[in-house]
């Protein structure tokens, strides 16, 4: 099933998406490269009454051999990119590698992500488990209303 340039595949093994390489299959996997792709995947799941899980690098993920009865979303492409915007800011997609973000920040002279150098996860995963918080500008925490992250 193709939705807005992103692909939703059904009956996808999840073991290859985890660091320990075990687990069953998901009913569906959406590899999303854009915010619109995520929106479309969520709509697709809601239309089917399916639960949703977002998966990053799979470094903190154990999947049951029974699999996941729902839609798994992976953030790829632009949603896993990293861009240094100025001397004080860097944009990271939720699917961006946390160690890679640390490297890019250090190369740009930015500080604050050093703790993540050895964490094999994603920026989105670090936000989810509250290891980091987004900031809008130097010294201010970022609070983004729905749809503002476009």
PLM regions and their residue ranges:
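FAD-binding subdomain of flavoenzyme oxidoreductases
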Residues: 111-118, 122-150
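Anion-binding (especially nucleotide phosphate/pyrophosphate-binding) glycine-rich loop
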Residues: 1-123
């Amino acid at each position: 099933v193709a939705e807005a340039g992103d692909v939703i595949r059904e009956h996808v093994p999840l073991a290859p998406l985890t660091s320990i390489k075990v687990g069953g299959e998901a009913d569906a996997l959406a590899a999303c490269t854009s915010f619109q792709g995520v929106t479309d995947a969520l709509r697709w799941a809601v239309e089917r009454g399916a639960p949703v899980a977002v998966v990053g690098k799979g470094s903190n993920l154990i999947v049951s051999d029974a699999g996941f009865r729902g839609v798994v979303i992976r953030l790829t492409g632009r949603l896993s990119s990293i861009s240094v915007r100025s001397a004080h800011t860097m944009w990271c997609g939720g699917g961006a590698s946390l160690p890679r973000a640390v490297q890019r920040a250090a190369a740009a002279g930015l500080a604050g992500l050093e703790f993540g150098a050895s964490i094999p996860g994603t920026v989105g995963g670090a936000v989810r488990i509250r290891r980091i918080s987004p900031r809008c500008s130097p010294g201010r925490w970022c609070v983004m209303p729905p749809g503002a992250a476009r």
